[in-house]
């Protein structure tokens, strides 16, 4: 079954924050800690961490597409975490909203405490429903800027190092993106024609590749005779319909991916910052590399891993599922889709798929 796609791309503030480059010619980077992570649908990375002195661990998504660090509003209410108006807003695919923030807090990772963090407050109830487990927050730029972070999708472990001279693994390639609060990488797209543009590298997006409709309209990169299908996605501000198609080739550094599932977003709130950025590459491609993210040097090292040649998922059902009150429930059904033709309706309870009755939404989305 087609994976429900969660596009989670935040842009904190309207201004651009540039990460200053620091030089550590003589001081080697030091390993501070390492810990396991879990993959959600689309390769999205889930880690557990503690907040201040609260003993119950929180579930966080590790997201290079987030311009800060944030908490779920329901989590702040449950644990009575104080927060105040920030006077700032976040921009997502379905809207713009003002956010509060909780100031001067500590994030406790296994073997590492990160202090003096300001957490923005957002409603992540839809994330919890999509993934079938409580999502308490997002870890983004506020964390990445402080360390060198190695993400190993073979061992399913994250290693955190101090800034300094770092010995990268042999092989692979070194990207040198433009680093604002989010990494922006020049890429080459080939379909009806060949186009070069900038794209965000977004580990929090559970998809392969996305381009804005404005980018496609202006570049005319897609073949017109290929008819996209409609899907529904979830992001900041609510739900939004999007088109799904295939691009002949997407090139990231020296690596070429062919027949790539591609989402087309009518980006009315310009969350993708077009025309400077054409869209994003998500973690269903990035998970095919072991990555080392080094904001201080403005470098990202990619090393192809055991998932590099995994097949893309081209399946399409036209249904979104959510985990609500212990049940897996169908949401909007795209008219004309296979789910629509099968007679599935909004609010139907999904008891099982292909003789699997596990009631596990993550499993159902991969069948």
Which residue stretches match the model-derived regions?
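Pepsin/retropepsin-fold aspartyl endopeptidases
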Residues: 19-367
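Bacterial Sec-dependent N-terminal signal peptides
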Residues: 1-25
